[in-house]
Amino acid sequence: MRTIPPSELIINDDGSIFHLHLHPGQVAPTVILVGDPGRVAMVAEFFDSRECEVTNREFHTVTGTYRGKRMTVLSTGIGIGNIDISVTELDALVNVDFATRQEKSEKQRLTLVRLGTSGALQPDIRVGEFVFSRTSVGFDGLLNYYKGRNDVCDLAIEQAFMRHTGWNELLPKPYFIDADRTLFEPFRDTTRE
């Protein structure tokens, strides 16, 4: 197994990961990602119990239980760069042995749920209304650097979009990804299409 060098995995002197300041074991299998650190408290107030709370810069984390299920809520700050840092460090926390700096042979999958706010152009969507995104569109180009990018993207929509808009080839290639449909099931009776 490959040993991950300190230049690629920065571990603080206290054994926590560099940006999030979390230790292995402090991340639940389900992670709710919010942008604003102030929203962490709003979400965590619904927790039945809290086992840890860690803050470093814009990264504020609370891990606890909700209806008996262990969950983590984490603020990422603004922008895709911060989200990339957060998700990369979450993955390392559950899939890398910090003592040996080697990837664990058995990988743990995290369920990540992004919870945020957005403006709306449609007049029938009221302020404060609950909205699910069926598809995510990225213009930042970050996903283009990841292995398996084409396996998760809707390539036909991407090509149609670029043709329709006359997409400038000097810009990063946009990407379109459909949300996991199972996310909508619990809310089917309380939302509209």
Name each model-derived stretch.
Residues 193:
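Short catalytic/ligand-gating loop segments at beta-alpha or beta-beta junctions
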Residues 2-190:
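Metabolite-binding pocket within alpha/beta catalytic cores that recognizes anionic/polar moieties
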